Amino acid sequence: MQIWKTFQLIPPLVKYTNAPTVGEKTEDKAVGVSKGGRNTKIHTLVDGLGNPIAFLLSHGNDHDSKHAIPLLSQINISGSNILGDKAYGAKAIRDYVDSHNAAYTIPPRNDVNDPWPVDWHTYKERNLVECFFQKLKWFRRIFTRYDKLDASFLAFVYIAAIVILLK
């Protein structure tokens, strides 16, 4: 008499998901996904000398104008001139700056029906924030984003800013 043993392949009962690892928080990690992969935007406020004042992280595929007001609300902007590129030319941002007794130098987009005047000589000073971002990219940990949590990534952005200020 022969005994036949049969084996069945049973699919797993547990579905493998991107569950948080031990010690990892499930909070928003400010990581966006696009065709190029995962990415994070660092929004920065700098003073007239190019020194960083405030930082904010967002998903890489979020529009810049969504995070301008939370970034500007971190400091007192009364009596100052806010420089920004065309992405920050939304009416809500301009109204926020006006309501806090500040001026803005933001060029209008090409498709705006009622463009506002821009002092292009003052607008040239916006290169200070671009220079700061180039200095920030010297740090490998920032331009590769090895950190899983946005709190630790933002902490290293602050450390890098301190190192840049001390040079």
Regions inferred by a protein language model and the residue ranges of each:
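Short alpha-helical elements
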Residues: M1-K167
